[in-house]
Amino acid sequence: MPVWSAVGVGLHLLSLVYAGTVAHASLAGMTEVPNIRELAEIPAVEVITRSAVMLMSAAAEKLGLSAEDPDESPQRDLDEARRLITALAGLVTASAEYLGPHAGPVRDGLKTLQLAFRESSAAPDEPGQGPGEKYTGPVW
């Protein structure tokens, strides 16, 4: 899969940050030492979105998309990627109505990962049998 496709997932997420729909600090907190906040103070949509971003990032790593050559990435693990993408699909499907303006970019990121998985597989799954497709339907 071309690296630019993986970058597309990140760009969608960055567009959420810079559009003001997600606080930059809330996404930065996943990679830096976060400010301590009471869990009860965090809106549900932020918890769901942060979880989706974490699943997307982990799946991209397991697909080897952070490497110049994904096929040679030491982090590449398609079995783990399948699990992460399926978990992401379940979360996105179950929470789409609550995500508001975040739903579209999160779904786009999910689809990009599903397509990247299909391209990475030596023997691609039949349509509808790929990771998360039991929740999203077949991905083309």
Language-model features, listed with the residues they occupy:
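A charge-rich, low-complexity, intrinsically flexible signal that marks solvent-exposed coils, linkers
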Residues: 26-140
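Ubiquitous "structural anchor" signal
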Residues: 16-18, 67
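Short, positively charged and aromatic/hydrophobic N-terminal segments
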Residues: 18-21, 26
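Residue-identity detector for glycine
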Residues: 8-10, 20
